[in-house]
């Protein structure tokens, strides 16, 4: 009976596979949104104010960072919790494949969230005249919460490795 439960629990890790695949569909949606933004800005490029162009570019950078985060979580999560990726030797491989454990994945996710939050905060500050001061305060507080959390996670990770 114990062996049955252990095998069933171990096999249940495959329930994560469709979730990771679903993230790839999210990446596809993000890609479509990215190009929608580009096609939206191209006809207006010469009439667009510099600050507005910078806001669009920050949005594109934001989407690129989120896309990278999705890829990292999909691939590392699959490798850590479901199965190793069997990639042909003649195919190009990402240099971090097979090297990111759940602890380093957490740190990379935290760093990515801080970077994404930083870009978002920069966009907010570029449009600060149109945003209520109390909202600005909350944007900064939320961003600092992400920063402090990332530092705390890194510190705790360092403590547990020594």
From Swiss-Prot:
Signal peptide: none
One GO CC term on file: plasma membrane
Bilayer-crossing regions: 10-32, 53-75, 134-156
Keyword line: Cell membrane, Membrane, Transmembrane, Transmembrane helix
Domain of life according to the entry: Bacteria
Localization per Swiss-Prot or TrEMBL: Cell membrane
Record membrane topology: Multi-pass membrane protein
Subcellular location, principal: membrane
Family membership noted in the UniProt record: Belongs to the UPF0114 family.
HAMAP family in the cross-refs: UPF0114
Identification of the protein by name: UPF0114 protein PSPTO_4583
